[in-house]
């Protein structure tokens, strides 16, 4: 973050200065009293189980220059500033929106049901060849992570790629009011969070909130093979990316190299790109095509775009292939799961050589689709010839309806012995479930064994 003054902060958050020097400089923003550094402003957030206002004195004592507060502390420490605001989370949003407005660089906002983080990372990899690029860390894509990402901007940055997630209506709009994108990306519309939104059509409406803050002369980049996204019509320039003939950015000549990755050709109105994607899964061609389209739009050369795709590295626990002795391969894709991403990952496993083991768990937030979706995934494991299926979790029991040979366990701890026993020589093992299942415990156990 570039230094700002208390006066600038005060104006950005529309607050009331209770105490402090308006000329004092602020070097950063922190919402965690445990990690606050000298010169930062502490923003106490209120959650279901905590109230950051209880830690204001601790943060100030640790070196914070001052704080925002909706609840004023009983004691105001001398030499520090205190700004009163109605709501600290909204103040954080206002500050991030004001700070982002100080930068005239291209901002890319990414959302979608599946593949947000992968696509964000791919775009950042491509843009990073030419531009010093800020990107959302991990998947810090909510009301707290997005402003923190934006507040990490510096004058050295030449582009920014911001991932925004949602589980309810209005969330993408809220985040977009901070990002104000020049380029808006929707990866697809799937069943994630359908429990809360009711239908794919409602999910589409929620995702399309991204366009409410897209600049009038901006660019929309959409999955051209997504039936619902093909109903979207915008006044802004729109590029549809995919395998279909109508796509503006066309993927062809897809060569599946198994766990070694994918090769494909991406053709735009201007250029033909021969792309080598260093991670498995045919679905990766969409992220690569979108990244190529954006790179070209922002003036990158053919060589820069091809090099950026080849340099892509997956974010943590997203189809991360770990190799072991005896040709054992662990496909760590445990960060999250929905029906579409689970099917895509199982197809990667199905294309792998040797014995194939799927360790799969609950797919959450599917509402009325829960039983059917899990049963269909079970059927897919049978169709793909997966040798061993280990299903874990309450919802995962429905996998066995689609594949009666699947082994079922109620919890990760109960299944651990069977998982270890199945990870034998010449085995490719996929580990995937919704984040709430904490399948990272399985990966940690296997990698330390």
Identify what each model region corresponds to.
Residues 110, 316-320, 436-444:
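ATP-dependent carboxylate/acyl-activation modules
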Residues 408-410, 426-447:
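Peripheral docking tails and interdomain loops at the edges
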């Amino acid at each position: 973050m570039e230094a700002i003054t208390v006066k600038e902060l005060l104006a950005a958050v529309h607050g009331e200065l209770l105490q402090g020097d308006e000329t004092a400089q602020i070097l950063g923003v922190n919402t965690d009293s445990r990690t606050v550094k000298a010169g930062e402003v502490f923003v106490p957030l209120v959650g279901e189980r905590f109230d950051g206002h209880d830690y204001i004195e601790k943060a100030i004592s640790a070196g914070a220059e001052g704080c925002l507060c909706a609840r004023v502390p009983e004691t105001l420490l001398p030499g520090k500033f205190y700004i009163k605001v109605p709501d600290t989370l909204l103040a954080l949003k206002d500050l991030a929106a004001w700070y982002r407005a100080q930068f005239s660089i291209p901002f890319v906002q990414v959302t979608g049901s599946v593949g947000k983080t992968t696509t964000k990372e791919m775009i950042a990899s491509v843009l990073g060849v030419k531009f010093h690029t800020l990107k959302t860390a991990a998947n810090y894509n909510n009301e707290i992570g997005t402003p923190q990402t934006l507040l990490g901007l510096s004058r050295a940055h030449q582009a920014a790629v911001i991932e925004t997630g949602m589980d309810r209506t209005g969330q993408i709009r809220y985040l977009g009011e901070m990002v104000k994108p020049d380029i808006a990306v929707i990866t697809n519309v799937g069943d994630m969070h359908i429990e809360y939104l009711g239908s794919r059509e409602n999910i589409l409406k929620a995702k399309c909130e991204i366009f409410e803050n897209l600049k009038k002369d901006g660019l929309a980049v959409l999955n051209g093979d997504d039936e619902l996204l093909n109903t979207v019509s915008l006044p802004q320039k729109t590029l549809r990316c995919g395998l279909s003939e109508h796509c503006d950015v066309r993927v062809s000549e897809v060569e599946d190299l198994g766990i070694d990755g994918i090769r494909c050709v991406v053709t735009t109105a201007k250029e033909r790109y021969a792309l080598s994607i260093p991670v498995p899964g045919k679905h990766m061609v969409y992220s690569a095509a979108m990244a190529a389209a954006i790179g070209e739009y922002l003036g990158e050369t053919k060589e820069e775009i091809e090099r950026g795709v080849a340099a892509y590295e997956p974010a943590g626990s997203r189809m991360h292939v770990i190799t072991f002795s005896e040709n054992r391969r662990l496909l760590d894709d445990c960060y999250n799961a929905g029906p579409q991403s689970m099917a895509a990952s199982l197809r990667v496993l199905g294309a792998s050589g040797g014995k194939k083991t799927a360790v799969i768990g609950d797919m959450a937030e599917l509402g009325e689709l829960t039983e059917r979706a899990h049963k269909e995934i079970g059927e897919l494991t049978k169709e793909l010839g997966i040798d061993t299926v280990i299903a874990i979790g309450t919802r995962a029991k429905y996998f066995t309806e689609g594949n009666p040979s699947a082994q079922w366990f109620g919890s990760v701890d109960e299944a651990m012995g069977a998982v270890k026993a199945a990870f034998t020589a010449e085995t490719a093992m996929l580990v995937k479930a919704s984040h709430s299942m904490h399948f990272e415990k399985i990966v940690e156990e296997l990698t330390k064994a």
